[in-house]
Amino acid sequence: MHRISLLLRKISTLLLFAYFSAGALTLGVAVYAIARLFIRDIRGRALFIRRCTSKGFRSINAAARLLRVYRVSLEGAVPSASEVRNTVIIANHPTLIDYMILTSLLPENTTCVVSGRLMSGFMRHIISHMLYISNDLPLEDWSSLISPEDAILIFPEGTRSSHHGWRIKFRRGASNLALRLGRDIIPLRIVC
């Protein structure tokens, strides 16, 4: 019975990965091309792409729940666009899908600080159209990329967390960022 369960789990995971890949291809080609052609305002285009990405990730989360690969449960309410306005949202990073889950839940006025390594290759086009910020950029250059309406999502641990405790060792960059930009901090904790 255990072998059958394991096989079903692997098949479900494979189906979810195929669904994710098809969605990424659709977003990466069709949605971004349409947005670039028809939405001239750069910020409006970024918000449209973020909204489409969020909806795509919501559908992946729903498929994952249906296939019993994973499920997302929340404690408390998802903050609204006005509640996250002009804040720095910090979160731990225990899995590869943290960004996907948070993006599906947070409002479209949330921009993300991404690793400079993601700014090379095909991902740089998607990231730049979403007006996400490379952590390689000096803070002085961020002001042209963010609006006071935006929340900034950052994973202060850097790469994925390797511990399961409540105490999380964040780097000081997120608090320094919030202080220098004069923004409040909203902490989020992801538990697997």
Residue ranges and their predicted role:
Residues 1-87:
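Membrane-anchoring hydrophobic helices of lipid-metabolizing enzymes
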Residues 66-192:
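Soluble catalytic domains of membrane acyltransferases
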